[in-house]
Design a protein with these regions (language model features):
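Short, structured secondary-structure elements
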Residues: 1-118
């Protein structure tokens, strides 16, 4: 559930339990499969969009869509969390050219940014 936001199917559980492979190797294989899934990308895109407060209130429809699309691209690319955070927190310029800069349109004051970031 943590990786895709969805419970495993009954068939997936049966296959996992029936697999005679070492438990650790079996889990690692499953994690790799889930991280490569479209469900993982969708879940974490939504999770990050929620955490970064992507909405139309400050960004309008196009800005929110562009920021969400940027987040999706980063999740699909499996960008490490520290790099993702750095891209958001150091984003500058036009939100059209650099959608990550939209974060600072949402959180307009340094206090708001600090409270949401820490």
């Amino acid at each position: 559930i943590d990786l895709t936001g969805l419970p495993p199917t009954a068939d997936d559980v049966r296959a996992f339990v029936a697999d005679p492979t070492d438990s650790r190797a079996k889990r690692a294989k499953l994690v790799d499969k889930l991280i490569g899934s479209k469900e993982y990308v969708e879940y974490w895109t939504n999770k990050w969009a929620d955490l970064l407060q992507v909405n139309r209130k400050f960004l309008a429809v196009e800005g929110a869509a562009a920021f969400r699309a940027w987040i999706r691209k980063e999740v699909e690319a499996n960008t490490p969390y520290d790099e993702f955070a750095r891209k958001v927190l150091t984003a500058k310029g036009s939100t059209k050219d650099n959608p990550a800069a939209a974060y600072f349109k949402i959180l307009r004051t340094p206090v708001d940014t600090m409270e949401n970031t820490t």
